[in-house]
């Protein structure tokens, strides 16, 4: 879904006030659900979640955590609900065989780095992770899902967006009241800079939680300086992607902002191709969008790849080592 504009306005906005009663009900139900005890998994669980609906940088965070766990001698597998996919699982994602419409876009990206299980039933998915040889499970999203007991939960926050107006859905982007969510996390991953994120960092530190600051770094290999591009993205914050391209020197002649997890259809591709041809520009998108494109499109669209770089990776490594000691 595309976040409505009033979510980033003050909570006194008329639409926010109108929807606030529904938000109190939704947020209260979600918070009560979070407090329920979960099933004991066959191996420890590291949950990568966020306080809000929409993108915050969970996927690159999960990929970085997989790398760090391996460096600590662990054998991680990734567990995802498979948002946007029609298969309920549990199943092992095979990028050569599965499409985004089947398993979701994020699992296809995750599966390039480590064994990835899609399962609507998280406990069943955890059992398949263990059967696949994992000794620790990295759960992509699921902070508000109580079905599994988590060893460690990290909340990812977009530094520029923060928590929007701070209200629960549908009045705002929060999945539950923030005060009810804090007790469920053991640390904050702050992606990017911005006043909203710094306010969250200050609150986390006041609560005695570590704050792991990070930024998305474009991978080298392509020279974007001076290139005319038609940039398009269906992610949580498309403008963030466009800003990154501009920072690399690309000349964006047209932007296409689609809802998060948008399933690209032939008509979308035809329109984008025609626009690029008219402008004498190349098409560029994100890794997450690329896996949702038709096969013929993936061959001709440029992809901006990014990795997550931590300001103090040692501190995060120490937290992981304490939570998941190598036997």
Swiss-Prot record:
Cellular component, GO annotation: plasma membrane
InterPro entries per record: LpxK, P-loop_NTPase
Gene Ontology terms for molecular function: ATP binding; tetraacyldisaccharide 4'-kinase activity
Enzyme class: transferase
SUPFAM superfamilies registered for this protein in UniProt: P-loop containing nucleoside triphosphate hydrolases
Catalysed reactions, semicolon-separated: a lipid A disaccharide + ATP = a lipid IVA + ADP + H(+)
Pfam families attached to this UniProt entry: LpxK
Residues noted as binding ATP in the record, renumbered to the chain: 52-59
EC assignment: 2.7.1.130
Biological or metabolic pathway of the protein: Glycolipid biosynthesis; lipid IV(A) biosynthesis; lipid IV(A) from (3R)-3-hydroxytetradecanoyl-[acyl-carrier-protein] and UDP-N-acetyl-alpha-D-glucosamine: step 6/6
Keyword line: ATP-binding, Kinase, Lipid A biosynthesis, Lipid biosynthesis, Lipid metabolism, Nucleotide-binding, Transferase
Annotated family: Belongs to the LpxK family.
Primary role: Transfers the gamma-phosphate of ATP to the 4'-position of a tetraacyldisaccharide 1-phosphate intermediate (termed DS-1-P) to form tetraacyldisaccharide 1,4'-bis-phosphate (lipid IVA).
Protein name, per record: Tetraacyldisaccharide 4'-kinase
Organism: Methylorubrum extorquens (strain PA1)
Gene this protein is translated from: lpxK
């Amino acid at each position: 879904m595309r976040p409505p504009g009033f979510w980033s306005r003050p909570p006194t906005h008329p639409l926010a006030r109108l929807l606030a009663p529904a938000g109190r009900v939704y947020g209260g139900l979600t918070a009560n659900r979070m407090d329920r005890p979960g099933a004991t998994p066959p191996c420890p669980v590291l949950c990568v979640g966020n306080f809000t609906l929409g993108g915050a940088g969970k996927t690159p965070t999960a990929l970085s955590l997989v790398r760090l766990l391996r460096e600590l001698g662990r054998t991680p597998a990734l567990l995802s609900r498979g948002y946007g996919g029609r298969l309920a699982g549990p199943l092992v994602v095979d990028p050569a065989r599965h499409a985004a419409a089947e398993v979701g876009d994020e699992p296809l990206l995750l599966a390039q780095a480590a064994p990835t299980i899609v399962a609507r039933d998280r406990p069943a998915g955890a059992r398949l992770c263990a059967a696949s040889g994992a000794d620790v499970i990295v759960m992509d999203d699921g902070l508000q899902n109580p079905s599994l007991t988590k060893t460690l939960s990290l909340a990812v926050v977009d530094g520029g967006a923060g928590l929007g107006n701070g209200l629960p859905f549908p009045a705002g982007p929060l999945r539950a009241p923030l005060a009810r969510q804090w007790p469920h996390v053991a640390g904050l991953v702050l992606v990017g800079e911005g006043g909203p994120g710094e306010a969250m960092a200050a609150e986390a530190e006041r609560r005695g939680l570590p704050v792991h600051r990070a930024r998305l770094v474009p991978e080298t290999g392509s020279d974007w300086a001076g290139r005319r591009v038609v940039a398009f993205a269906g992610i949580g914050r498309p403008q963030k992607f466009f800003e990154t391209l501009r920072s690399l020197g690309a000349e964006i002649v047209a932007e296409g902002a689609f809802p998060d997890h948008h399933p690209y259809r032939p008509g979308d591709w035809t329109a984008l191709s025609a626009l690029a041809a008219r402008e004498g520009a190349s098409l560029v998108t994100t890794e997450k969008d690329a896996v949702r494109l038709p096969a013929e499109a993936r061959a001709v669209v440029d992809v901006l790849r990014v990795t997550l770089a931590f300001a103090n990776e040692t501190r995060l490594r120490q937290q992981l080592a304490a939570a998941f000691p190598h036997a």
